[in-house]
Amino acid sequence: MASLGLQLVGYILGLLGLLGTLVAMLLPSWRTSSYVGTSIVTAVGFSKGLWMECATHSTGITQCDIYSTLLGLPADIQAAQAMMVTSSAISSLACIVSVVGMRCTVFCQDSRAKDRLAVVGGVFFIIGGLLGFIPVAWNLHGILRDFYSPLVPDSMKFEIGEALYLGIISSLFSLVAGIILCFSCPLQGNRSDYYDSYQAQPLATRGSPRPGQPPKAKSEFNSYSLTGYV
């Protein structure tokens, strides 16, 4: 029961990590305008994501435009696009494999195969979490570096957007989910020792009493000889 509960907790965390990664990948708020120095008073605020950038006017109107070309984007944005898409794909595969390997499902009745599939799903969650964490940390480092650099104009400085916070939390969820699934399955030797020893016994000895167990007493009826009544 403990391993079943751990598998459920791990799967829920992995599913939340996948959904959070998808939302963070699509949000256009990886970088937001920084209101420091000469850019404190401005009528337009900008935010940039992996696929589009948005401009929010003082009137409350927001306009978003998808990038016209992907090849002209900075290297960190292109790498983040590839890694986030790969992370989402691997995490989706991890969800499918983990469902088959969980003990509460009816797929693949062989318990040993289910345990292996659960571990494989956990490994996929770990890989997906790492692929989602790397681009988020990379962009986070770039934002902080430019923000504190005196060589970058104030109008070109950005702050950390909500999507980066969501990406960090989602990747951590995926990593924790993978670790839980990998360690939720018991050791094969401890679980199947009795089963293997029972299968190894010959048929003639399965009905014999175990060592240290007293033999069953014969019934009173069997103790009488039938020849005494003839």
Curated annotation (Swiss-Prot):
The gene is CLDN2. Belongs to the claudin family. One of its GO terms (molecular function) is structural molecule activity. Residues 205-230 are annotated as: Disordered. The chain crosses the membrane at residues 8-28, 82-102, 117-137, 163-183. It is found in: Cell junction, Tight junction; Cell membrane. The lineage of its organism: Eukaryota, Metazoa, Chordata, Craniata, Vertebrata. Gene3D superfamilies: 1.20.140.150. Residues 229-230 are annotated as: Interaction with TJP1, TJP2 and TJP3. One of its GO terms (cellular component) is tight junction. The record marks 65 as: Paracellular cation selectivity. This is Claudin-2. Residues 220-230 have a biased composition (Polar residues). It catalyses: Na(+)(in) = Na(+)(out); K(+)(in) = K(+)(out); Rb(+)(in) = Rb(+)(out); Li(+)(in) = Li(+)(out).
